[in-house]
Amino acid sequence: MARYLSRADLSRIAGKYIDQYYTRFGISKDAPEPIDPERLASAVLGLNVKMLPLCSDGSVLGLTVFQRCGFTVTLGDGTKLVEIFMPKDVVIDSALAADDCTGCRNFTIAHEAAHQILADLFPNDYGKAVKCRGHIAYRERNGQPSWEEWQANTLAAELLMPTFLVNAEIERAALCLPNGILYKSASDPNYERILEMAARIGVSWSAIRIRLQQMQVINGKPIHCHPLDVIRFGE
């Protein structure tokens, strides 16, 4: 079973690697910049990031490799591809190379990097998990929730959206939600600002929304119908 790690524990772990990333690329927290997960994975963690077709139905977003192994994927036309993966390989499904998949691609890279970070930091705990599941950890689009996957997702979010960076982006975007209410509507200027924040950081709308909720910038779920929409469309 994976070691118990709280959100605060995972935030501290992420902070150490972000510090290394900023030092490596000469970035100051006084003028924070978004974290490129591929650069973090390769330059800081020593991982090999690749893009290959992993499935024909979009169910497997990415995987990371702990021991040398073979991997076979059957494409939609029946073609079988066989790849040999090595330790520290991070493989992202090539369908995520599209421009409109930037958020999902970045989060998947960060998620797989998180698995490697946890395995490096806690080899005894995660070594047992590795033996149970084989040599590969997968990120599935609709995978079953587990403690280890929660940890990888939480660490990935902390790597991509550390509090200091999100706060800087809130200030840059002049985001103002005094009552914590957000309307998921073009009638709410805050919605457009949050979309711009997500694009700058390189994450999806869902990822930034969840992060802002965790930081209590947004209270509850966004409301889909803005009062101005009612006036315009007579709803």
Predicted regions and their residues:
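Active-site hotspot residues in diverse enzymes, especially metal/ion-binding acidic/histidine motifs
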Residues: M1-E235
